């Protein structure tokens, strides 16, 4: 996030100055989305790391020591875990740990004194996410967007902009509970010819009435996800990141479709990109997430 800058116009001015080599004052954001990598291999998952009850704790323990070498004024590390692992992960945090923990989403409604006291069966209100020890949440990930689109389609709803309105409620609930938000946007292959319209609506509707300094944008080129798909190249990512900054007054933008060892240096070379979202660290052989590979990706991206 940009430092000591108040208004969106001044943030955008600082971004333009940075592009022209005049100055640069930015925070890097390294996010980790652990999805459901906790599912054991014998059940169809990719977890070879630890027994399920210890999985979240092990990840924190194997990463927080090495991350202490980085300046917390220059880079933040947030790990987004499935809810079942948050308590053990929080318990594993050392004093002054460089790791912040986050949830993989929040519900669009919340508890409140004198209001709903917790009638949210199956749902995850932002209040409990904060109470569990989380500092951030992930909202609008392409997998969440696809789920919401599927539910709306089953209900016969053709207005897919409703997804952005639902996500806007989630963002507001998260911020009201004191959580930072990583808000994901992205276009499918069908939407790519009108990428600017699609992304513009995701930004304008999803962030309507939102306290933007509490939000970082994660860009997911959904059309590039999956085996055999061509990854977005540097020029395309740069174009989108510039568009997002121009539309939002200079909000921070991270690459959301896998910061990994083979693209870390390329992404680090893009001035408009402020970090990335790591997920799987190994894509062949024993596919999965491995803490030592996560740390190597960070080293490659930060150049340290």
Where are these regions (language model features)?
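Conserved N-terminal beta1-alpha1 strand-loop-helix module at the mouth
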Residues: 13, 21-101, 108-114, 218
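Glycine-rich phosphate-binding active-site loops on the catalytic face of alpha/beta enzymes
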Residues: 35, 141-147, 272-293
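Conserved, mostly hydrophobic/aromatic
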Residues: 82, 129, 220, 267
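Conserved anion-binding
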Residues: 143-228
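C-terminal helical cap(s) of enzyme catalytic domains, especially alpha/beta-barrels
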Residues: 154, 283-304
